[in-house]
Amino acid sequence: MNVVQVPTIVRNLAIQFHRSMICAFAFISIWSTGAFAQTSHPHNASPQAQTDDQKNNQSALIKIVRDSTERFQDVAEAVREGYTLQFGCVSGPDQGAMGLHFVNSDLVSRGIIDPTRPQIVIYEPTGDGHLKLIGVDFLLIASVWDADKTHTGPPQLMGQLFHFWESPNRFGLPAFYTLHIWAWKENPNGAFVNWHPNVSCQSFGGN
């Protein structure tokens, strides 16, 4: 498997950070919405008991994500398809980390939920300077989603309710809906929570 070292990625993509985010969000209102999705509470909740149907749906969704993103185990392929590094390495004070987010600004601007086309692919920096694919993130700008009258409520994907993230936020984005899926690294707190307790940004050499 081909890999791209972290310092190389940072040098190649740092300039694109502000440009891509400005292009993707220039037309979007920064005002918060009154949506009733799950809030972005900083701590992970304990996994809840699930029915067999829920478990089957979750397994099916994870499989779709894995099948659709397997090629991105080589981060160079993600870059070729329009994903660029944003936000540095996202970590939390006491709940682990989210890792490195490679964002496809075109997919974000479209605002479409497609399990085979995540807006973000997530990597963890490793001790040897490489990147390991660990999951994906589906991200929708809240004001755009809520303005569409065909939507009867907050976004869901195969039964998984998106989390609502208010503005202002650490990412400098308008309020948004997000759904992390830890398809490539098992999360003891569940496959669809925001934070991964076993992900670390310690090996990240960028800013």
Residue ranges and their predicted role:
Residues 35-37:
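Boundary at the C-terminal end of the N-terminal hydrophobic targeting segment
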Residues 39-207:
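Primary mode marks residue(s) on the alpha4-beta5-alpha5 output face of response regulator receiver
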Residues 20-31:
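Bacterial N-terminal signal peptides
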